[in-house]
């Protein structure tokens, strides 16, 4: 249904800062452009927080808001919608 995650890193600044919490809604979710989402990296299997910038059929292009400090679709390409765990809502600490 939902979970809480702690933000680590700077890739989503200023929207989400290191130490912030995100509430991740997992039910009845279909990603839309500009959504902030949590997904499993296709490279390392780590959980990442990124923003949906493009949608193409069953895949999303995901990028960090802080382009200078983000490992995202610019490195690993399109991410299948099935890898997205849910929509994230930032709760600042």
Regions found by a protein language model. Give the residues of each.
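Extended hydrophobic leader/signal-anchor segments used for secretion and membrane insertion
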Residues: 1-93
């Amino acid at each position: 249904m939902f979970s809480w995650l702690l933000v680590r890193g700077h890739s989503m600044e200023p929207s989400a800062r290191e130490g912030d919490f995100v509430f991740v809604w997992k039910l009845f979710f279909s990603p839309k452009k500009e959504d902030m989402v949590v997904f499993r990296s296709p490279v390392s299997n780590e959980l990442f927080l990124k923003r949906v910038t493009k949608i193409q059929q069953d895949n999303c292009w995901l990028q960090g808001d802080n382009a200078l400090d983000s490992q995202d679709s610019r490195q690993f390409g399109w991410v299948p919608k099935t890898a997205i765990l849910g929509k994230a809502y930032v709760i600042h600490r």
